[in-house]
């Protein structure tokens, strides 16, 4: 496969991930929200209901993070094939501390099979060091926009953060 030589200044890729657990009052399905930034510029966003009903916030946040990791992998491949260098690991921000911690611990054991599959996908990316999972408090998580209706104060704060 002929790939172009990497040229130019390396770009920084980051992802904000969030899930609204059981936010749909009719079906109780969760909602995923993702925002992908390239050098602090929003280049992609994703907002969609999840296909399964989750019994825990951990499960819905893990599904959201796995969706984000899949999108990041596709973006990294596109940038790689265009010869755009990437500056280290992609920063992935999530507002659930337990999801962040389990993504970083290889000895974690999960009992639900579908959660374990999503976890291993995230864990493989973290072990390969092409993502770095970090905690982002819910008050400043930009992907919160895409999952639920926010109070006016929080919405203004996130909009201000997004536009600066």
Where are these regions (language model features)?
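RNase H-like nuclease fold core
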Residues: 7, 12-58
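Amphipathic alpha-helical
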Residues: 1-5
């Amino acid at each position: 496969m002929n790939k172009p030589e990497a040229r130019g200044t390396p770009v920084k890729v980051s992802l904000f991930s969030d899930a609204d657990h059981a936010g749909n009052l009719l079906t109780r399905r969760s909602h995923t929200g993702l925002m992908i930034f390239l050098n602090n510029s929003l280049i992609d966003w994703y907002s969609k209901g999840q296909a399964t009903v989750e019994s825990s916030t951990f499960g819905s946040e893990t599904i959201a993070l796995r969706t984000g990791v899949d999108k990041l992998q596709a973006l990294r491949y596109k940038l790689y094939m265009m010869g755009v260098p990437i500056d280290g690991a992609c920063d992935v921000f999530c507002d659930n501390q337990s999801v962040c911690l389990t993504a970083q611990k290889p000895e974690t054991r999960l009992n639900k099979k579908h959660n374990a599959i999503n976890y291993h996908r995230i864990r493989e990316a973290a072990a390969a060091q092409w993502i770095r999972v970090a905690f982002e408090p819910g008050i400043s998580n930009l992907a919160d926009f895409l999952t639920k209706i926010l109070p006016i104060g929080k919405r203004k704060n996130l909009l201000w953060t997004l536009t600066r």
